[in-house]
UniProtKB/Swiss-Prot annotation:
InterPro entries: rRNA_ssu_MeTfrase_G (IPR003682), SAM-dependent_MTases_sf (IPR029063)
Binding-site residues for S-adenosyl-L-methionine, renumbered to this chain: G82, L87, A133, E134, R151
Compartments reported by the entry: Cytoplasm
Function noted in UniProt: Specifically methylates the N7 position of guanine in position 518 of 16S rRNA.
Protein name: Ribosomal RNA small subunit methyltransferase G
Any one cellular-component term (Gene Ontology): cytosol
SUPFAM superfamilies given in the database record: S-adenosyl-L-methionine-dependent methyltransferases
The encoding gene: rsmG
UniProt source species: Corynebacterium glutamicum (strain R)
Similarity comment: family membership: Belongs to the methyltransferase superfamily. RNA methyltransferase RsmG family.
Top EC class, one word: transferase
EC number: 2.1.1.-
Keyword terms: Cytoplasm, Methyltransferase, rRNA processing, S-adenosyl-L-methionine, Transferase
Length: 223
């Protein structure tokens, strides 16, 4: 089945699908390929993806987001804040159709795009909410979830104040972070505790599949 209702200009060059994609997305590989094509074309034209990122979409964006499912139990609820063009929420939803995922995005043009992708790829496990995670109306719509994810949204302390109120007591925020994560933990430890966060862990996922595994920070909500 081809998912052609996502706009993709004719004659566009697409990278060969890397072998790791089949391992990560399994039976939903075709959906992942369609999402890659959409980001490379429509996503780039609409300003969601920079032109220099297009050749690196698989490795730097889609695969490293898809593998975060390794850190999640079966059938849980997930909220992805500041979802943008759907990273990490869309790859996660494709890789883990058992998860119930809410994408939270404040900008209209991006939330419209997310709904287009959801419909085009038949992602029945995805809900899109336009708004900011810190807004009361959004918190009421989302309710409490098992895990809140994010990618390149904000410094760690601010991220904790936005994420943890959406998490059930005992649940976690799981954020994609870079090499400076330990420095962020040291700098923002007080703000994290104030937000109700504890049991901070840093680990990697995707070691067996990716040349550069994904670094995650996990913070449990205590109160």
């Amino acid at each position: 089945m081809l998912y052609r209702s996502i706009s993709c200009p004719k004659g566009t060059f697409f990278m060969t699908t890397p072998p790791a994609a089949a391992e990560i997305f399994g039976d939903n590989l075709e959906k992942a390929i369609a999402y890659h094509e959409s980001l490379a074309t429509d996503g780039s034209v609409r300003g969601f993806i920079g032109p220099r990122e297009v050749p690196r979409l698989w490795d730097r964006h889609i695969l490293n987001c898809g593998v975060i499912g390794e850190a999640m139990d079966e059938g849980i609820s997930v909220a992805d804040i500041g979802s943008g063009a759907g990273l990490p929420g869309i790859p996660l939803a494709i890789a883990r159709p058992d998860l119930n995922i809410t994408l939270i995005e404040p900008l209209l043009k991006r939330s419209v795009y997310l709904n287009e992708v959801k419909e085009a790829l038949n992602l029945d496990n995805v809900t899109v909410i336009r708004g900011r995670a810190e807004e009361k109306v959004v918190r009421k719509q989302v309710g409490l979830v098992d895990i809140v994810t994010s990618r390149a949204v904000a410094p760690l302390g601010k991220l904790a104040t936005w994420s943890l109120p959406l998490v059930k007591i005992g649940g976690r925020m799981v954020a994609m972070k870079g090499s400076s994560v330990e420095e962020e933990i040291e700098r923002d430890a007080k703000e994290i505790r104030k937000a109700g966060g504890t049991d901070i862990k840093v680990y990697t996922v995707g070691e067996a599949l990716l040349s550069e595994p994904t670094t995650l920070i996990s913070i449990r909500r205590e109160k």
